[in-house]
Amino acid sequence: WPVKGRVIASFGPRSDSTHNEGINIAVPIGTEVLAAEQGTVAYAGSELKGYGNLILLRHEEGWVTAYAHNEEILVKRGDKVKRGQSIAKAGKTGTVDQPQVHFEVRQGQKPVDPLPHMEKL
């Protein structure tokens, strides 16, 4: 898991007709955010609206993981990271009202429910 905490929003349709493309995990500000698997930092910044400070990791076989709403980013584009490595400090940047990590797993461009994959971690 990228962080240990309480899942406050699950993958899938929301009551407001939008779709959560990941899960949201409530954690205290400053909690270490860990890479779910080894990979390369494809993006580390705050330009994507709503996500706040965001990290995208590219993994083997076209998999990508996303970690959003971070207080502080500890890696930069091109860095190689190991599974379990600290990549950020959790926060409440972007469009959220409480400290949390928004975590996505994608196969190529397609978002998939992270929970079945996290059971293996």
Where in the sequence are the language-model features?
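Solvent-exposed coil/turn segments that connect beta secondary-structure elements
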Residues: 12-14, 28-30, 38, 46-47, ...
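Short histidine-centered loop motifs in beta-beta connectors
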Residues: 44, 60-84
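Surface-exposed, glycine-biased beta-strand/turn segments
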Residues: 1-51
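Short, well-structured beta-strand-loop connectors
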Residues: 32-41, 75-90
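Residue-level recognition of beta-strand microenvironments
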Residues: 10, 44-45, 70-73, 90-93
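Short, acidic/hydrophobic/Gly-rich beta-strand patch recurrent on exposed beta strands
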Residues: 22-26, 53-59, 102-104
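Conserved, short, structured surface segments that act as functional micro-motifs
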Residues: 79-121
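Terminal peptide-recognition signature
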Residues: 7, 39, 57, 84, ...
